[in-house]
Amino acid sequence: MRKIRTKICGITTPEDAAAAAAAGADAVGLVFFQGSSRAVDIARAKKITAALPPFVSVVALFVNESAQNIRRILAEVPIHIIQFHGDEDDAFCRQFHRPYIKAIRVQTASDIRNAATRFPDAQALLFDAYHPSEYGGTGNRFDWTLLAEYSGKPWVLAGGLTPENVGEAVRITGAESVDVSGGVEASKGKKDAAKVAAFIATANRLSR
């Protein structure tokens, strides 16, 4: 049986984390990028992770952050996986000795085709919509048909997903992992528990 794994990104409160876990999320994402409306600091991150049950993975999202700050956060917050969303290269990403996901902002098929070669040590790649000045969480989607024949390194689909379109997205791309942030929000940084539950329920129905 194939299970569609779900990550709810941009969690900012313990209550939203607990609701995501209760709905069946496999992972939650904490944004440590101060340029984001969904950013959290170490103190807030500790409260969020304390609200989670066992076996829900915590993913820390960084954008062009210094190695020193990343190490400080990893030392204080229980992080399972790092997600790099900026211009980091493989050598930078692998130095923390933690499984990492590299976000790829997709414009053309070559972005997808070359990603595994550029990031050989990544546990997975996350394919997101390209934006010239923003690093994820834009609500934009890219051409999902570009992924229809992809069979490389494990990957995650992101970019403009919602409870209403995640089914179509999975059918077109064959994604086995999906990541959502803005598509399940009531407002910037605040999740809508009903939308979170609907998103995860749809993904679960697609599992086989």
Curated annotation (Swiss-Prot):
SUPFAM superfamilies: Ribulose-phoshate binding barrel (SSF51366). Keywords: Amino-acid biosynthesis, Aromatic amino acid biosynthesis, Isomerase, Tryptophan biosynthesis. It comes from the Bacteria. InterPro entries: Aldolase_TIM, PRAI_dom, RibuloseP-bd_barrel, TrpF_fam. The keyword Isomerase applies. Its EC number is 5.3.1.24. Pathway: Amino-acid biosynthesis; L-tryptophan biosynthesis; L-tryptophan from chorismate: step 3/5. Belongs to the TrpF family. This is N-(5'-phosphoribosyl)anthranilate isomerase. It comes from Neisseria meningitidis serogroup B (strain ATCC BAA-335 / MC58). The lineage of its organism: Bacteria, Pseudomonadati, Pseudomonadota, Betaproteobacteria, Neisseriales.
